Amino acid sequence: MTIIKQEKTLFFFKNLQNIICNTFSKIDGKSLFKEDMWNTKKGYGRTRILKKGKVFEQVSVNFSHVFGKSLPKSSSNKKRDLENCSYQASGISVVSHPKNPYVPTSHLNIRFFLAKNKKRKTIWWFGGGFDLTPYYGFYQDVIHWHTIAKKICQPFGDDIYFKYKKWCDDYFFIKHRNESRGIGGLFFDDLCLPDFHSAFLFSKSIGKGYIDAYFPIVNLRKSYSWGSRERNFQLYRRGRYVEFNLLLDRGTLFGIQSNGRIESILSSMPPLVKWEYGWHPKPNSPESKLYTDFLPIKDWIDK
């Protein structure tokens, strides 16, 4: 049964990677993904990168299936019975860095773990989610994003959206900046109940939901005019993305702690970014509205 579970998830991840890459390429209309197939003693994967497109400056869509003899601390802190236990981890990770500052950055991750505890019993779970990081916020976009997120969760329970939204808000909060990375979405981990079929079905819904949630926003904003002011703000805000990924993100930490393939792990980084000492947006400016209207955690749709 364990082999069947693994085969089903691997097929899903690979197929979802194809669908998402085709959708990005179609919308961009200029650049195509370059594929890097890799294979090491610790696993294998398929890294796909789109660069210097018409709409997207860079997009990474990664599939991987890795193995290890000792589950890294980033995944075992809450699973004491799995410390120093062997594991397998497979999944897909997507990060888009648009060229146009009015198009938000997006992130999707779905992962499946198999591990054997100290009693040699096989333990499995799913994790993942998606979140949105705008530079210039639009209420229409945020409400659309969270409406899709709630729609995904509805068949699995009335409280699921609000549970995973809060988890996302908490997870993507940059403590050293005292601000959110973006406007959130969904985040879940350790999902193994009520059974494999239900947990897998929810994880598949996350993949489809990302497509339904993100690409309509891209199509709506990709033709907006922008200049150096918007570009500079975009590069500055990308700095927050880098800070979170390198300091706080469990996926990045897992890859580093497991001595994973660093090129693939860091492919989520934006190609260009900037920091400015002591910079603050002018009051009542379009840039300031990101901080006052969109980054504060709130319920975007009614309970």
Curated annotation (Swiss-Prot):
Region Important for dimerization, residue ranges: 241-276
GO BP terms, alphabetized: protoporphyrinogen IX biosynthetic process
GO molecular function: coproporphyrinogen oxidase activity; metal ion binding; protein homodimerization activity
Site (Important for dimerization): 176
Binding, substrate: 93, 109-111
Cofactor(s) named in the record: a divalent metal cation
Principal localisation: cytoplasm
Matches recorded under Pfam families: Coprogen_oxidas
Pathway membership, UniProt: Porphyrin-containing compound metabolism; protoporphyrin-IX biosynthesis; protoporphyrinogen-IX from coproporphyrinogen-III (O2 route): step 1/1
Gene3D superfamilies assigned: Coproporphyrinogen III oxidase, aerobic
Root EC class: oxidoreductase
GO cellular component: cytoplasm
Keyword annotations: Cytoplasm, Heme biosynthesis, Metal-binding, Oxidoreductase, Porphyrin biosynthesis
Matches recorded under InterPro entries: Coprogen_oxidase_aer, Coprogen_oxidase_aer_sf, Coprogen_oxidase_CS
Localisation per UniProt entry: Cytoplasm
Catalytic machinery residues: 107
Binding site for a divalent metal cation: 97, 107, 146, 176
Reaction catalysed by this enzyme: coproporphyrinogen III + O2 + 2 H(+) = protoporphyrinogen IX + 2 CO2 + 2 H2O
NCBIfam families in UniProt: PRK05330.1
Quaternary context: Homodimer.
PANTHER family: COPROPORPHYRINOGEN III OXIDASE, MITOCHONDRIAL, OXYGEN-DEPENDENT COPROPORPHYRINOGEN-III OXIDASE, MITOCHONDRIAL
Family per record: Belongs to the aerobic coproporphyrinogen-III oxidase family.
Function: Involved in the heme biosynthesis. Catalyzes the aerobic oxidative decarboxylation of propionate groups of rings A and B of coproporphyrinogen-III to yield the vinyl groups in protoporphyrinogen-IX.
The name this protein goes by in its record: Oxygen-dependent coproporphyrinogen-III oxidase
